[in-house]
A protein has these predicted regions:
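Short, charged N-terminal helix-start/capping segments
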Residues: 1-4, 91, 95, 181-186
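Conserved aromatic-histidine-acidic binding/catalytic patches
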Residues: 34, 66-74, 83-85, 146-153, ...
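Short, well-structured alpha-helical interface segments that form or flank functional binding sites
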Residues: 41, 59, 73-77, 85, ...
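Glycine-rich, often proline-containing surface loops adjacent to acidic residues and nearby aromatics
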Residues: 57-63, 139-141, 185
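Short, surface-exposed "cap/lid" segments of acyl-processing enzymes
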Residues: 45-125
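Alpha/beta-hydrolase fold nucleophile elbow
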Residues: 170-185
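N-terminal cap/lid segment of alpha/beta-hydrolase-fold proteins
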Residues: 1-56
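Alpha/beta-hydrolase active-site loop
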Residues: 108-172
């Protein structure tokens, strides 16, 4: 799915024989990474919570988090409760460029605070500027299409996850398991 990200040389439509050039905006804050090359966004892990009864789960709930989330802490009790009450496995799936799919420095107060201060000076009417959203705001400001492209990447990653599930690649979940989607954002 990484081929959908800005910076990829593989943006091509076979049906229309049309190649797309990547047009990403530029930032002045060392956040101008080529999306296609953010390794932690391409190769990532996800958590699975399930009952400990040593059987393959015949159902799975894929949980999506909200925009700009950085940690699974508040979702773990929910995943546990969902798994316990339904008997299904729960997969905590990180959307593109979030959680463990974003460089750690994007969550660093020390590194993002100066960027937030600069944004506050540039956009004085924005009263919600903080180091917490400095990276995502700066990157989306430079290239708003990132929201669409990362959504498309997440969609394709989920298609791959379900393909792997159906092929039996998730040993504690039955290949015939039902799949439910659960999204939450504050």
């Amino acid at each position: 799915a990484k081929y959908y990200l800005p910076g990829s040389e593989h943006l091509f439509c076979k049906e229309h024989n049309l190649a797309f050039t990547s047009q990403s905006g530029h930032t002045q804050d060392d956040l101008d990474w080529v999306d296609y090359e953010v390794e932690c966004n391409i190769h990532f892990t996800y958590h699975i919570v399930q009952p400990l009864d040593n059987r393959k789960s015949d159902g799975v709930i894929i949980v999506f988090h909200g925009l700009n989330e950085k940690k699974w802490d508040k979702y773990l009790p929910w995943a546990y409760a969902l798994s316990k009450r339904t008997g299904k496995a729960v997969i905590l799936f990180p959307i593109a460029f979030h959680m463990n799919r974003a460089p750690e420095r994007w969550s660093s107060r020390q590194e993002m605070y100066p960027i937030a201060q600069k944004r506050m000076a540039e956009y004085p009417d924005n009263s919600d500027t903080s180091y917490v959203n400095a990276a995502i705001s700066t990157r989306l400001d430079a290239f708003p299409q990132r929201l669409f492209w990362s959504g498309l990447q997440t969609y394709n990653d989920i298609v791959q996850l379900i393909t792997d599930l159906r092929a039996g690649a998730l040993p504690n979940i039955a290949p015939t398991a039902t799949v439910d989607l659960f999204g939450y954002s504050i």
